[in-house]
């Protein structure tokens, strides 16, 4: 093989390695975002009994407390 052919193959190998490394980073970032969303949901959906009872009377969900007062809504967001 000529020197030019070896250089082309080397460049192709480097390009392949660089793109696979980027894909792994994007996948890791996506997994990290999914974990953060799960944590946020579990924190906001967990309310105390007083809040749950207060909102249950209004046929709504307890979304936590704001300034010490229960916050009720049909659907809780973040």
From Swiss-Prot:
Keywords: Amidation, Cleavage on pair of basic residues, Disulfide bond, Knottin, Neurotoxin, Secreted, Signal, Toxin. It is found in: Secreted. GO terms for cellular component: extracellular region. Disulfide bonds join 51-63, 55-72, 62-76. The modification Phenylalanine amide is found at residue 77. Expressed by the venom duct. It comes from the Eukaryota. Residues 1-24 form the signal peptide. GO terms for molecular function: ion channel inhibitor activity; toxin activity. Residues 25-44 form a propeptide. Belongs to the conotoxin O3 superfamily. The presence of a 'disulfide through disulfide knot' structurally defines this protein as a knottin. This is Conotoxin TsMSGL-13. It comes from Conus tessulatus (Tessellate cone). The lineage of its organism: Eukaryota, Metazoa, Spiralia, Lophotrochozoa, Mollusca.
